[in-house]
């Protein structure tokens, strides 16, 4: 069976080359998704948003919205994950958010009342996380 699996991998690479995709880029893109999946797990996004980003169900964590039908672009999502959403349970995950990195035009050192700032992810990790969410969960818009 492992020979079959290896053969499929070779065929996939050959197909990618035939249609003009740069095979090293495919591997690089996959590593970015792996990094995004790791950031999703480290930040425990599934606790609030559900294991398949379908929206949380409560319990011990706030009910986060479904990410499957979001209409935000990636840049907006990076901002939300980085700085959280003041007045909601959405925390700020960016290292240095509100202290070293300006959020929502607030002066450094000013954190909104009630804002949780775990600040465990780098900017690159947040970008990878957002890429992972879009590639894995967000449904393509209908024409």
Q: What would you call each of these model-derived segments?
A:
Residues 22-41, 55-56, 63, 76, ...:
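Electrostatic cytochrome c docking/interface patches
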Residues 101-143:
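C-terminal capping alpha-helices of c-type cytochrome domains
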Residues 36, 42-52, 81, 129-133:
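The canonical Cys-X-X-Cys-His
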Residues 37, 50-118:
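Gly/Gly-Pro-rich "capping" loops immediately C-terminal to redox-active cysteine motifs
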Residues 32, 44, 73, 121-125:
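An acidic site on a long C-lobe helix of protein kinase domains
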Residues 45, 86-89, 138:
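Generic structural signal for secondary-structure transition and capping sites
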Residues 11-20:
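Bacterial N-terminal signal peptides
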Residues 1-12:
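Bacterial N-terminal signal peptides that target proteins for export
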């Amino acid at each position: 069976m492992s020979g079959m699996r290896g053969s499929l991998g070779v065929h996939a690479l050959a197909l990618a080359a035939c249609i003009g995709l740069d095979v090293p880029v495919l591997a690089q893109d996959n590593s970015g998704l792996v990094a995004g999946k790791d950031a999703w797990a480290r930040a425990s996004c599934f606790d609030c948003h559900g294991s398949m980003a379908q929206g949380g169900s409560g319990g011990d964590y706030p009910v986060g919205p479904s990410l499957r039908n979001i209409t935000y672009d990636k840049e907006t999502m990076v901002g939300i994950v980085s700085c959280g959403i003041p007045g909601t349970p959405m925390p700020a995950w960016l290292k240095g958010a509100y202290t070293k990195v300006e959020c929502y035009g607030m002066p450094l050192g000013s954190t909104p009342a009630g804002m949780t700032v775990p600040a465990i992810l780098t900017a690159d990790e947040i970008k990878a996380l957002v890429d992972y969410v879009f590639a894995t969960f967000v449904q393509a818009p209908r024409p």
